[in-house]
Amino acid sequence: MDINTETEIKQKHSLTPFPVFLISPAFRGRYFHSYFRSSAMNAYYIQDRLEAQSWARHYQQLAREEKEAELADDMEKGLPQHLFESLCIDHLQRHGASKKSITRAFDDDVEFQERMAEHIRYMVETIAHHQVDIDSEV
């Protein structure tokens, strides 16, 4: 077997992108392995850093969501449905609605009460989201 055939075989079966066997054994022993070892270590280090950053972002997002939820809960307690009933009585009577129909909707209509509660929750969650944005800017 001539040297070219042997070189081709080694290149085909080599895992490195260049022919390692052409490097002197002394160089391979001292520098080559330490270079690849440090490169592998750097690759693991970079991967670990990326994963740590990903987890940090995840925990920040969880903390933000928890802060928003707590703020929304507090706001929801301060915004009961009877305040909306009073608002509707004050303003809708001027536009043809009777006090009795408004009171019946707020007191007796379960579907209306459920949808009103959903709407109030949506309002306070949106306001809480914007409040956390404003607080984080400062």
UniProtKB/Swiss-Prot annotation:
Pfam families this protein is in?
A: Gam (PF06064)
Record carries keyword Nucleotidyltransferase = no
> What does the PTM comment of the record read?
2 forms, GamL and GamS are isolated from overproducing cells; the shorter form (GamS) is more abundant. As both have good ribosome-binding sites they may be independently translated. GamS is processed at the N-terminus and starts on Tyr-44 and Ile-46; both start sites are present in equal amounts. In cells with an induced lambda prophage a protein consistent with the size of GamL was isolated.
Which terms in the Gene Ontology molecular function aspect does this entry carry?
deoxyribonuclease inhibitor activity
Signal peptide (UniProt feature, chain positions): none
Q: Which domain of life is it from?
A: Viruses
List GO BP terms, alphabetically: symbiont-mediated evasion of DNA end degradation by host; symbiont-mediated suppression of host innate immune response
For this chain, the annotated S-S bridges are: none
Q: Which UniProt keywords apply?
A: DNA end degradation evasion by virus, Host-virus interaction, Inhibition of host innate immune response by virus, Viral immunoevasion
Question: Which purpose does this protein serve, as stated in its record?
Answer: Both GamL and GamS bind to host RecBCD nuclease and inhibit its activities, protecting the viral DNA against RecBCD mediated degradation. Isoform GamS mimics DNA, preventing RecBCD from binding DNA. Expression of this protein in E.coli renders cells more sensitive to fluoroquinolone antibiotics (which inhibit topoisomerases and induce dsDNA breaks). Frameshift mutations that delete most of this protein (starting from position 78 or 97 of GamL) allow the bacteriophage to overcome the retron Ec48 bacteriophage defense system.
Tell me, how does this one assemble? Answer: Homodimer. Interacts with host RecBCD without displacing any of the subunits; this interaction prevents RecBCD from binding to DNA. The GamS isoform makes extensive contacts with RecB, and inserts deeply into the RecBCD complex.
Protein name as annotated: Host-nuclease inhibitor protein gam
